[in-house]
Amino acid sequence: MARKSLIQREKKRQKLEQKYHSIRRSSKKEISKVPSLSDKWEIYGKLQSPPRNSAPTRLHRRCFLTGRPRANYRDFGLSGHILREMVHACLLPGATRSSW
């Protein structure tokens, strides 16, 4: 189980990313429209003004139950070993164990 502080830090990053998402998107659109290099550099400066933790690349998927940051399945929002346990216990409808 991940520490509570790490999970809270990730939630804080998600809120910041949502807050600054429109600003980043509009700045990137402006860059493609502006022909002069000096204007582009000004817009790049605006892109660097939001906090670092508001960048979408700093977000990390975590397991919904345990907060584990590795081996996450996007479809379920669970880490691999929790997913396996839940499938074995028949808690996920439609998921079957592979057998050959």
From Swiss-Prot:
Main localization category: plastid
GO biological process terms held by the UniProt record: translation
Region listing for Disordered, in residue ranges: 1-31
Subcellular location: Plastid, Chloroplast
InterPro entries linked: Ribosomal_uS14, Ribosomal_uS14_bac/plastid, Ribosomal_uS14_CS
One CC-aspect GO term: chloroplast
PROSITE patterns assigned to the protein according to its UniProt record, in alphabetical order: RIBOSOMAL_S14 (PS00527)
Gene3D superfamilies to which the protein is assigned, alphabetical: 1.10.287.1480
Swiss-Prot/TrEMBL keywords: Chloroplast, Plastid, Ribonucleoprotein, Ribosomal protein, RNA-binding, rRNA-binding
A GO molecular-function descriptor: structural constituent of ribosome
Family of the protein in this entry: Belongs to the universal ribosomal protein uS14 family.
Reported function: Binds 16S rRNA, required for the assembly of 30S particles.
Name this polypeptide is given: Small ribosomal subunit protein uS14c
